[in-house]
């Protein structure tokens, strides 16, 4: 139980200073009030039952312990809700009458004891009400002189004892005080040095902070510049990436086209290879055809006229290309299957070929002589056939080396065109010319010259003589005249063209 054991406080009641002492012992409250000016004393003792009954009568019940705490708070002025007041009996009666609302009547005569009694009023203020707890204090009179003298003596003794103790310990106290002061001075000096060092560090930090701020500003500017450059580079990179994406798409499209072209060329190569194999396997020397009859000559003349009409309708570029490729060799029947193999040397065939070349040279000289002198009765027809035939037909079959050289030169020119242009159009033209050349080689031998149709009604002797003159003039060579040299030249040309085509395909593979 937290109760004040003893408390003495100077308190001013109505402008007069009083000393108030409170003592709580168990369930008993002791109060004593003394006037500082007159030394009059008022004292009272109250038990717990009296206090609780008093609070019950006021209408706001308080327990004894709570009442003691309220009294202590009023003396120490620690709470604004409780205050103290000291009233006489007359003041108390007027307060009671004012509270009850009655008129102040004539006061009855009072005794001297009531006039000397004082009432300590504990005022408890709540939000809308004020409650007064009166504590009566009987008058005790002035203090006894004998008691006062005893108190004075005891106080003097205590004072002397304390002074003696002070005299003995004065020097020690001063020395201790000086020592403490010196320690304090040294401590303050060390604190001063620490503060000076801290101030120097603060100044250095301030200077460093200023430099750091300047450096930070410079770095911020650098970062802003780098961010601007980064944005520009990103935009440029996006544009470059877009252009490269377009290039990639274009190149992918070109690659697809090249692959498609490669596939078509491979298919064409496969077709040509198969045709070559068939050509090598199916080569046979056809039997000697009998002289054409009247109906055959009529049909051949019609075919020649139709072929001349189709040839005139073709484009000049393709006609010139075919003319350059076909110049130097006339159309001839397919060679025998033994032409692709390496033949052994035959002296009889060599002698016959040499004699045949000499006869052809003599025929050419005779033709030149007839052309120069105007010729005989059939001279105009022969000269007309020489004019209508291409220059290669006039040279006859005896210039096989020249034809092989022409073929090799055409293959070399095709290779140079493929390597320089790197396009597929030349290859397609080459394949077309190759197919046309193959068809011409595999086709029937050309019909007699156009003017042979006018001799349809001539006797067989004249027709045979006419065929011999055509053979001598280079217009048409019989199948027997198609020797192994011509077959070897055709095979060499086909092999050279296939080799050039294979090289072109390899270059396409390396590019892709």
Swiss-Prot record:
GO molecular function terms attached to this record: identical protein binding; microtubule binding
GO cellular component: centriolar satellite; centriolar subdistal appendage; centrosome; ciliary basal body; cytoplasm; microtubule organizing center
Positions carrying N-acetylmethionine: 1
Annotated spans, Disordered: 276-477
Known outcome of mutating residue 266 to E: Loss of microtubule-binding
Free-text function comment from the UniProt entry: Microtubule-binding centrosomal protein required for centriole cohesion, independently of the centrosome-associated protein/CEP250 and rootletin/CROCC linker. In interphase, required for anchoring microtubule at the mother centriole subdistal appendages and for centrosome positioning. During mitosis, may be involved in spindle assembly and chromatin alignment by regulating the organization of spindle microtubules into a symmetrical structure. Has been proposed to play a role in CEP170 recruitment to centrosomes. However, this function could not be confirmed.
Family as reported in the entry's similarity comment: Belongs to the CCDC61 family.
Miscellaneous comment: The N-terminal 3D structure (head domain) resembles that of NHEJ1/XLF, PAXX, SASS6 and XRCC4.
PANTHER family tied to this protein: CENTROSOMAL PROTEIN CCDC61, YEAST SPT2-RELATED
Protein name: Centrosomal protein CCDC61
Taxonomic source organism: Homo sapiens (Human)
């Amino acid at each position: 139980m937290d109760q004040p054991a003893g408390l003495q406080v100077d308190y001013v009641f109505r402008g007069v200073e009083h000393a108030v002492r409170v003592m709580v012992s168990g369930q008993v409250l002791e109060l004593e009030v003394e006037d500082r000016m007159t030394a009059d004393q008022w004292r009272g003792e109250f038990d717990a039952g009296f206090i609780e009954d008093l609070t019950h009568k006021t209408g706001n019940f308080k327990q004894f312990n709570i009442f003691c705490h309220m009294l202590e708070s009023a003396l120490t002025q620690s709470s604004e809700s409780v205050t103290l007041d000291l009233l006489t009996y007359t003041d108390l009666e007027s307060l009671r009458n004012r509270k009850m609302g009655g008129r102040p009547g004539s006061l009855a005569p009072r005794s001297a004891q009531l006039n000397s009694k004082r009432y300590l009023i504990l005022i408890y203020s709540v939000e809308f009400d004020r409650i007064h707890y009166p504590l009566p204090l009987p008058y005790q009179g002035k203090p006894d002189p004998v008691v006062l003298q005893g108190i004075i003596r005891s106080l003097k003794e205590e004072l002397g004892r304390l002074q003696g103790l002070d005299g003995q310990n004065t020097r020690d106290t001063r020395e201790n005080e000086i020592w403490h002061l010196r320690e304090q001075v040294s401590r303050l000096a060390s604190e001063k040095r620490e503060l000076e060092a801290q101030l120097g560090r603060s100044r250095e930090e301030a200077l460093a902070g200023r430099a750091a701020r300047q450096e930070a500003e410079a770095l911020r500017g650098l970062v802003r510049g780098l961010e601007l450059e980064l944005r520009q580079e990103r935009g440029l990179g996006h544009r470059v990436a877009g252009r490269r994406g377009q290039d990639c798409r274009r190149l992918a499209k070109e690659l697809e086209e090249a692959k498609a072209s490669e596939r078509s060329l491979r298919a064409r190569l496969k077709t040509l290879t198969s045709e070559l194999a068939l050509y090598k396997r199916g080569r046979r020397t056809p039997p000697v055809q009998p002289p054409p009859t009247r109906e055959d000559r009529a049909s051949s003349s019609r075919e020649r006229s139709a072929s001349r009409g189709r040839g005139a309708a073709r484009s000049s570029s393709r006609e010139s290309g075919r003319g350059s490729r076909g110049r130097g060799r006339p159309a001839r029947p397919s060679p025998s299957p033994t032409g692709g193999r390496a033949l052994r040397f035959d002296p009889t065939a060599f002698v016959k070929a040499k004699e045949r070349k000499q006869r052809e040279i003599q025929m050419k000289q005779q033709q030149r002589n007839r052309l120069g002198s105007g010729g005989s009765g059939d001279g105009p027809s022969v000269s007309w056939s020489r004019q209508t035939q291409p220059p290669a037909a006039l040279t006859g079959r005896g210039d096989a080396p020249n034809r092989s050289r022409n073929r090799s030169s055409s293959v070399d020119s095709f290779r140079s065109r493929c390597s320089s242009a790197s396009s597929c159009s030349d290859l397609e033209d080459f394949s077309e010319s190759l197919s046309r050349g193959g068809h011409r080689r595999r086709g029937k031998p050309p019909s007699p010259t156009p003017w042979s149709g006018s001799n349809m009604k001539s006797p067989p002797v004249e027709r045979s003589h006419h065929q011999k003159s055509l053979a001598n003039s280079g217009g048409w060579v019989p199948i027997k005249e198609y020797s192994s040299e011509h077959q070897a030249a055709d095979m060499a040309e086909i092999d050279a063209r296939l080799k050039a085509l294979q090289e072109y395909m390899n270059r396409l593979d390396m590019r892709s």
